From Swiss-Prot:
One Gene Ontology term of the molecular function aspect: zinc ion binding
Record PROSITE patterns: DNAJ_1 (PS00636), DNAJ_2 (PS50076), ZF_CR (PS51188)
Assembly mode: Homodimer.
UniProt similarity note: Belongs to the DnaJ family.
Family annotation (NCBIfam families): DnaJ_bact (TIGR02349), PRK10767.1 (NF008035), PRK14300.1 (NF010893)
Biological role: Participates actively in the response to hyperosmotic and heat shock by preventing the aggregation of stress-denatured proteins and by disaggregating proteins, also in an autonomous, DnaK-independent fashion. Unfolded proteins bind initially to DnaJ; upon interaction with the DnaJ-bound protein, DnaK hydrolyzes its bound ATP, resulting in the formation of a stable complex. GrpE releases ADP from DnaK; ATP binding to DnaK triggers the release of the substrate protein, thus completing the reaction cycle.
One GO cellular component term noted in the UniProt record for this chain: cytoplasm
Name of the molecule in the record: Chaperone protein DnaJ
Gene Ontology terms: biological process: chaperone cofactor-dependent protein refolding; DNA replication; protein refolding; response to heat
Keyword annotations: Chaperone, Cytoplasm, DNA replication, Metal-binding, Repeat, Stress response, Zinc, Zinc-finger
Protein localization: Cytoplasm
Binding site for Zn(2+) 1: 149, 152, 202, 205
Natural source organism: Rickettsia peacockii (strain Rustic)
Length: 373
């Protein structure tokens, strides 16, 4: 009793299409006449191909399961189907599929590309300042690209001319030729793999359906954009070949360093110089903010050099949000270098008072002891 197609491939009747393909590729590699000298290799290889040709199609597989092996073969014989003759799939195709499935490799198809080809994506580096990043801005950019031909409207054919299907390959773009055990597929020599013939190419774009041009485009930069943000503009890349879809334009944002602020996410940091009098007595001073103008910042009495004071919601805006970050001021107490006579007298008096207080409470000597203990 002859084996059924499932037995030939070594799988169960409930095997998935993926399991069928794996089994076929493994056996085809093993028994292909070009890879083995076994006497029964050609016969075995034909059986494997016949089995897979039936089972890989859901409709024919269902008919096979319903009729059974013998009845299905008889019906195929009467209908003239199932005759593979001396045809052998290209061993390179089998190896390509095998390594793609089992070795994790990528296979490059030998089939030519279609006439329509998608345009390439473009990248544009745009530098903005921090204020522009905070508020958001619309920028006009200029770049070289390919655009859809306005004479042939992307078809590649001279105005009024039609693009005809290649009669040599019937629009497939490839021709197949059998030589012994091998089937060779190559790009159609008549249409160069396009599948179509342009009898009268457009003079402006030379049959490509596009041409090079310097483009100007207005791009919207949203408020709160961060350094390194990439903004995609769909369809604004290079035009496709012969009516293919356009690629995309990616605008990469770089924010210039600021003279006052340093950015930390949505927070801003700045160095704030104050006099030692303000640090000691406290008070209010005006500080600039990123949105423009100034706000009052309260300096607590006794503020030390290096202290950090926070202005809430005075940092950067956030994309697609009403929430803002904070501004953190880092205090830098400035000591005057040039004193008037009166200022010196007052400071000398302050010095004496300070020494007496330290001596009376002993804190000065206690601090000194702690440094040496």
């Amino acid at each position: 009793m002859s084996q059924n197609y499932y037995q030939i491939l070594g799988v169960s009747k409930t095997a998935s299409q993926a399991d069928l393909k794996k089994a076929y590729l493994k056996l085809a590699k093993q028994y292909h006449p070009d890879t083995t000298d076994a006497k029964d290799a050609e016969k075995k290889f034909k059986e494997i191909n016949a089995a897979y040709d039936v089972l890989k199609d859901e409709q024919t597989r269902a008919a096979y399961d319903r009729l059974g092996h013998d009845a299905f073969q008889n019906q195929q014989s009467r209908g003239g189907g199932g005759n593979h003759g001396g045809f052998h799939p290209d061993i390179n195709d089998i190896f390509g599929d095998f390594f793609s499935d089992f070795m994790g490799g990528s296979r490059r198809s030998s089939r030519p590309t279609s006439a329509k080809v998608r345009g390439s994506d473009l990248k544009y580096n745009l530098t903005i300042n921090l204020e522009e990043a905070f508020h958001g801005i619309e920028k006009n950019i200029s770049f070289s690209s390919t655009v859809k031909c306005d004479t042939c409207h992307g078809s590649g054919s001279e105005k009024g001319e039609t693009v005809t299907t290649c009669d040599a390959c019937s629009g497939v773009g490839a021709t197949r030729m059998q030589q012994g055990f091998f089937t060779i597929e190559q790009a159609c020599h008549k249409c160069q793999g396009n599948g179509h013939i342009i009898k009268n190419p457009c003079k402006k774009c030379h049959g490509m359906g596009r041409y090079h041009k310097q483009r100007n485009l207005s791009v919207n930069i949203p408020a709160g954009v961060e350094n390194g943000t990439r903004i995609r503009h769909t369809g604004e890349g290079e035009a496709g070949i012969r009516g293919g879809n356009s690629g995309d334009l990616y605008v990469d944002i770089t924010i210039k360093p600021h003279d006052i602020y340093k950015v930390d996410g949505a927070n801003l940091h700045c160095k704030l110089p104050i006099s030692f009098v303000n640090a000691a007595l406290g008070g209010e001073i005006e500080v600039p903010v990123i949105e423009g103008g100034k706000v009052n910042l309260t300096i607590p009495a006794g503020t030390q050099n290096g202290d950090q004071l926070r202005l809430r919601s005075k940092g950067m805006s956030k994309m697609r949000s009403t929430i803002r970050g904070d501004m953190l001021t880092h205090i830098h107490v400035e000591v005057p270098k040039n004193l008037s006579k009166r200022q010196r007298e007052l400071l000398e008096e302050f010095k004496k008072e300070s020494i007496n207080e330290k001596e009376n409470d002993g804190s000065f000597f206690n601090k000194m002891k702690s440094l040496w203990s």
